[in-house]
């Protein structure tokens, strides 16, 4: 397995302010990965491509899922990601320089300081929420659901805490942020007409 690309990316990202949480680590004959944290402390992972047959099988399944999710995400699937930040300028600068992401203010968010994140396609695949100095920094997955209040009740019955929501944007999108019993944050959302 060639780790030179992964090592180059880790070195480049640390020069931009990221810190290494888990150094480059081999996963059998499948791949190498590293876990870094952005300047706000949010963890993210990098993976290297491999010529391993098992890696190619996993990539094929993953890419099929991404194509399906991009066309029409299924309920319960990860359909978005969100970066919550106490310093939107620093966060935007890091991810723009690190990965070439583009940020555009979301006029449909009802006056919230929310930016759509474009990771290379014409449609956004995530968002950045400027929470101000009193907020909390996070980088979390967002799952598409049919009924946000119902999912909130279920999550609470299983020991989770609904940190925020449900709230509704002017365009009808309903969302909540949840902290599971193990301390993992995620959001759930539904869209109009589901």
What label would you give each PLM region?
Residues 43-50, 101-137, 181, 185-191:
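Conserved short beta-strand elements that form part of the metal-binding/catalytic scaffold
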Residues 1-40, 87-89, 142-185:
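Vicinal oxygen chelate
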Residues 15, 27-31, 82-124, 150, ...:
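Core segments of cupin and vicinal oxygen chelate
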Residues 31, 43, 53-55:
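Short, well-ordered, mixed-charge alpha-helical segments that flank or form enzyme active sites
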Residues 78, 123-126, 138-140, 173:
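Structural motif
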Residues 3, 47-93, 101-104, 138-143, ...:
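N-terminal beta-strand motif that seeds the catalytic metal site of vicinal oxygen chelate
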Residues 28, 74-77, 133-138, 170:
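Short glycine-enriched loop/turn motifs at secondary-structure junctions
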């Amino acid at each position: 397995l060639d780790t030179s690309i992964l090592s180059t990316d880790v070195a480049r990202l640390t020069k931009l302010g990221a810190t290494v949480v888990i150094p480059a680590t081999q996963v059998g004959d499948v791949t190498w990965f590293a876990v870094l944290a952005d300047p706000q402390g949010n963890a993210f992972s990098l993976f290297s491509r491999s010529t391993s047959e098992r890696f190619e099988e996993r990539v094929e399944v993953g890419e099929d899922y991404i194509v399906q999710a991009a066309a029409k995400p299924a309920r319960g699937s990860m359909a978005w990601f969100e970066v919550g930040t106490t310093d939107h300028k620093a966060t935007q600068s890091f991810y723009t320089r690190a990965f070439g992401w583009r940020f555009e203010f979301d006029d449909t968010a009802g006056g919230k300081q929310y930016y759509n994140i474009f990771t290379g396609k014409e449609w956004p695949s995530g968002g950045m929420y400027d929470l101000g100095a009193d907020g909390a920094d996070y980088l979390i997955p967002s799952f598409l659901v049919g009924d946000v209040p119902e999912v909130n009740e279920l999550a609470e019955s299983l020991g989770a805490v609904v940190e925020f929501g449900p709230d509704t944007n002017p365009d009808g999108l309903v969302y909540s942020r949840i902290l599971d019993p193990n301390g993992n944050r995620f959001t759930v959302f539904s869209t109009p007409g589901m």
